[in-house]
């Protein structure tokens, strides 16, 4: 007797979520850009004892760091990608990413940034305490995993 298709599909999704699929090169470059930008913002804020702002798509000026994305990577969450479980009941709806403000005390304005390339997506979640959570959406398994 053959197992039902839904059981096979669920088994396939479970196995696929455990495989170490690498990020596509444009999203890998974007992830590195985000991590470098955040690290630099925290470092500059602590060193100069003043607030630093990390902004998407803006020109860098004094006290402001600009984040540029590689070609093909776009801001926002695609419609067919669900919110991560940690944001499901947060009331977050999306839209353009707002600037992240980092203070010298290693605190930050809580914020969420989504970016995507095709069907793959990244979610950068920054808490008030300054802790960073970076998640990726894996379309094959339909789930968010730590990046």
Give each language-model segment a name.
Residues 2-147:
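N-terminal helix-rich module
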């Amino acid at each position: 007797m053959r197992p039902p298709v839904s059981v096979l599909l669920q088994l396939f999704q479970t196995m696929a979520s455990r495989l170490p699929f690498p990020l596509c090169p444009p999203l890998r470059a974007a992830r590195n850009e985000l991590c470098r930008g955040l690290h630099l913002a925290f470092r500059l804020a602590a060193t100069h004892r003043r607030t630093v702002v990390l902004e998407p798509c803006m020109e860098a000026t004094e006290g402001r760091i600009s984040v540029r994305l590689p070609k093909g990577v776009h801001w926002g969450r695609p419609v067919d990608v669900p919110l991560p479980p940690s944001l499901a009941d947060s009331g977050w709806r999306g839209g353009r990413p707002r600037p992240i403000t980092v203070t010298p005390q290693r605190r930050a304005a809580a914020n969420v940034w989504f970016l995507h390339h095709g069907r793959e997506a990244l979610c950068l979640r920054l808490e008030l305490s300054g802790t960073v959570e970076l998640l990726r959406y894996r379309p094959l398994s339909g789930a968010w995993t730590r990046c």
